[in-house]
Amino acid sequence: MSQLTHINSTGEAHMVDVSAKAETSREARAEAFVGMKPETLAMIIEGRHHKGDVFATARIAGIQAAKRTWELIPLCHPLLLTKVEVQLEAQTKYNRVRIESCCRLTGKTGVEMEALTAASVAALTIYDMCKAVQKDMVIGPVRLLEKIGGKLGHFKVEQ
């Protein structure tokens, strides 16, 4: 099993020193879901929400969150992201919204946390915008789908 990289020999948390690492191309994809009543989902799809376009707002929130992950998650490095994409899909069969994020850069550390943060904050934004209509929406699961690049190479979730 791998060692925890953010814990030093005395058990203290610290930010990993990546100064000696080579810059490589890295990408990560994550997903999140927001479950809701059919009426709430229909309101979003039909654009009837009094606060405006729920998907557009959630997309922008996810993008902004990815860019600020280092301010939200302790010990994360500030990264120069070259791509952040957030896609939202209404899944009427399951009464939910599926969010998929993709983050990319050329750098010394991975972008998994940025992708996970983008998907999570997009989901939280949907909840925030729709909570007046439905308070019992369910967020989750949230998970990493794929990681490309870095020392550990390629990871992809099995479907």
UniProtKB/Swiss-Prot annotation:
Q: Which residues bind substrate?
A: L75, C76, H77, M113, E114
This protein's gene is called moaC
Keyword match Lyase: yes
What does the subunit section of this Swiss-Prot or TrEMBL entry state? Homohexamer; trimer of dimers.
Catalytic activity line of the entry: (8S)-3',8-cyclo-7,8-dihydroguanosine 5'-triphosphate = cyclic pyranopterin phosphate + diphosphate
In the UniProt entry, which residues are flagged as the active site?
A: D128
Name the residues that span the membrane: none
The UniProt record lists the EC number as 4.6.1.17
What family does this chain come from, according to its entry? Belongs to the MoaC family.
- In what pathway does it function? Cofactor biosynthesis; molybdopterin biosynthesis
A single GO molecular-function term is:
GTP 3',8'-cyclase activity
Record keywords, A-Z: Lyase, Molybdenum cofactor biosynthesis
The top of its lineage is: Bacteria, Pseudomonadati, Pseudomonadota, Gammaproteobacteria, Enterobacterales
Q: What HAMAP family has UniProt attached to this entry?
A: MoaC_B (MF_01224_B)
- Report which superkingdom the organism of origin falls in: Bacteria
Pfam families referenced in this protein's UniProt entry, alphabetically: MoaC
Q: What class of enzyme is it?
A: lyase
**Keyword 4Fe-4S included in the entry's annotation:** no
A GO biological process held by the record: Mo-molybdopterin cofactor biosynthetic process
Q: Which InterPro entries match?
A: MoaC, MoaC_bact/euk, MoaC_sf, MoCo_biosynth_MoaA/MoaC, Mopterin_CF_biosynth-C_dom
Function of this protein?
Catalyzes the conversion of (8S)-3',8-cyclo-7,8-dihydroguanosine 5'-triphosphate to cyclic pyranopterin monophosphate (cPMP).
- Could you identify this protein by its name? Cyclic pyranopterin monophosphate synthase
